Amino acid sequence: MIIGTKQEFENLADYVLRDYLGSEYESYSPFNVTAFAEEYLKLEISFFDFNPEENIEGMRIGNKIILDRRLCDPIRVGERNFTVAHECGHEIINWQDPTYVPYQITNYRFKNQHKELKTEDDFKEWQANVVASCLLLRPNLVMWSMDKFLKADKLTVFGDCRFYALDLYYFKMMARYLGVSQTCLFYRLSRLGLLDHQPDSAYDPRKDVLYR
């Protein structure tokens, strides 16, 4: 298992992104994670009808990523992209291990798989999630999107996760443009210091209007 801090895994993802994108790194185009997986990491992506009761979103066998066909639904593009990015994260991290043999890999990704970090596998999943969010949401793209959609340097959050209605509307539009889930975007905004955390008591319903 590769050991490292969150910052070190974020730096690793950024290094790989710059190598793959070149001058396009500074562009404002959403990241095509499928093309990255196939062109840069040489992974093959296909779809399969998994049993819905098993909550499998994807699996990895050797250099093949097999996704649940339900992720083809346009409304689940964020889930699909993150699942691919998650597997890319595993691959990038595994590259750092000189004993890594890609064709011996077999694992599954389950929907809503939230675990405490107790086992080695738990930490590996956490590592892949960190890299995945960085691949999908490089800093310059996120900050440009903040200015484009929210017209602000930071997104105001009251309590744990309460927004003004208009801010929430543009936040959802931003996630849709970037091709990520709202959960992934919220986490990345937090890591980049782009959330303005306020107590619930600071929320003013008089300002909570849909249109400015």
Residue ranges and their predicted role:
Residues 1-212:
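Active-site hotspot residues in diverse enzymes, especially metal/ion-binding acidic/histidine motifs
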